[in-house]
């Protein structure tokens, strides 16, 4: 089932269902991308591994609301500059190199010190 979505104009409202397999790397990326999107993003079949939970905890530390139920996970993104925190923070990426690499790119312009722990 290969379908391509081509976007030719600015998106104001994107309501499309995309079905992918439950995968750790995709789940981490979904959490991070959803956190910088504007509005609510919902994922079904999200892999709830230790690394994905670390990504969820990381965006929560950055002021993003995340709702987890038995059926789905919702991230309430605040846009590309929506991370809100008023002090130096520590983000524990656990053992996730994917989370560590990707979140540094999102936080590169922070005016606060950010300590990233990966073990």
Per-region residue spans from a language model:
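Short, structured segments at the rim of ligand-binding sites
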Residues: 1-119
